[in-house]
Each structure stands twice: as C-alpha cells, then as structure tokens.
Amino acid sequence: MNMNATLLGQAIAFALFVWFCMKYVWPPIMEAIEERQKKIADGLSAAERAAKDLDLAQANASDQLKEAKRAATEIIEQANKRKGQILDEAREEALTERQNILTQGEAELETERNRARDELRKQVATLAVIGAEKILERSINLEAQKDILDNITAKL
C-alpha cells in the first residue's frame, strides 16, 4: 500500500503541477505563440503588400519612363521644328539684307557715276573754254564763260 499512497501522492502532485502550469505557465506561452503567429502572419501579409506595391511602383515607373521618353521626343521634335523656322527666318533675313545692300550699293554707284560724269563734263567744258581761249587768244569775261560752260554742260 505504500506504493499506492505514493502513486496517489504523485498523481495529486502531478495534477497540481498540471493545474498550476495550465493556470499560470500555459497562458503566457500560448499568448507568446499566438503573438508570434500574428507577427509572422502580419510579416507575410506585409511582404505580399510590399510585393504588390513593388509591382505597382514598377508599373508606374515604367509608365512614367514611357511618358518621359514621349515628352522628350516631342520636345526634340519641337526643337527641330523651331530650329528649321529660325534657319528659314535667318535665311530670309539674310537674303533681304543682301538685296538691300545690293540696292543701296547700286544707288551709291549710280550717284557716284552721275557725280563723276558731271565732274567730267565740267572739266571738259573748262578745257574746251581754255582751248577756245587759246585758239581765239582772247579772254572771255567771266559771265560769258559761265554761259558757255552751262551750254556745253547741258549738251553733254
């Protein structure tokens, strides 16, 4: 019977130990396990969200990159068009300036030609009067000389 009392004592001690563990030890362990499971589940869902966010961000980045390339291409095309316009305007302006310079040069040349022609006429008239004076060996008065020069100039 000794053995039975010992066995019964051990069974009671074991039952008290189990009750004590279930009352005070088991709940914090279960709470820690549940908290750990929750953290793991939250981590997995966060990883899934992060993966989805990454995919979305990559898609957005790809779209933005495409949009940026399109915008850059459009800007380059506009710049090329503007370059062509500027070159055309500069070409037209240069041609207009060239024409103005040529017209001005021709006008100056014509003016200079007329001035030289008038100067030559005066010199020829003066030489003719001097020659005529020498031929006639007489001096013509200044008023008569002026009239003769004007007549000769007008005829030339």
Curated annotation (Swiss-Prot):
Pfam families, per database record: ATP-synt_B
InterPro entries: ATP_synth_B-like_membr_sf, ATP_synth_b/b'su_bac/chlpt, ATP_synth_F0_bsu_bac, ATP_synthase_B_chain
Primary site of residence: membrane
Annotated SUPFAM superfamilies: F1F0 ATP synthase subunit B, membrane domain
Residues that span the membrane, as ranges: 7-29
Keyword annotations: ATP synthesis, Cell inner membrane, Cell membrane, CF(0), Hydrogen ion transport, Ion transport, Membrane, Transmembrane, Transmembrane helix, Transport
GO cellular component terms listed in the entry, alphabetical order: plasma membrane; proton-transporting ATP synthase complex
Compartments, record wording: Cell inner membrane
Record-linked PANTHER family: ATP SYNTHASE SUBUNIT B, ATP SYNTHASE SUBUNIT B', CHLOROPLASTIC
Entries under HAMAP family matching the protein: ATP_synth_b_bprime
Assembly information from the UniProt record: F-type ATPases have 2 components, F(1) - the catalytic core - and F(0) - the membrane proton channel. F(1) has five subunits: alpha(3), beta(3), gamma(1), delta(1), epsilon(1). F(0) has three main subunits: a(1), b(2) and c(10-14). The alpha and beta chains form an alternating ring which encloses part of the gamma chain. F(1) is attached to F(0) by a central stalk formed by the gamma and epsilon chains, while a peripheral stalk is formed by the delta and b chains.
Role noted for this protein: F(1)F(0) ATP synthase produces ATP from ADP in the presence of a proton or sodium gradient. F-type ATPases consist of two structural domains, F(1) containing the extramembraneous catalytic core and F(0) containing the membrane proton channel, linked together by a central stalk and a peripheral stalk. During catalysis, ATP synthesis in the catalytic domain of F(1) is coupled via a rotary mechanism of the central stalk subunits to proton translocation.
Protein family according to the UniProt entry: Belongs to the ATPase B chain family.
NCBIfam families associated with the record: ATP_synt_b, PRK05759.1-2, PRK05759.1-4
Protein name (database record): ATP synthase subunit b
Origin organism lineage: Bacteria, Pseudomonadati, Pseudomonadota, Gammaproteobacteria, Vibrionales
Gene that this polypeptide is encoded by: atpF
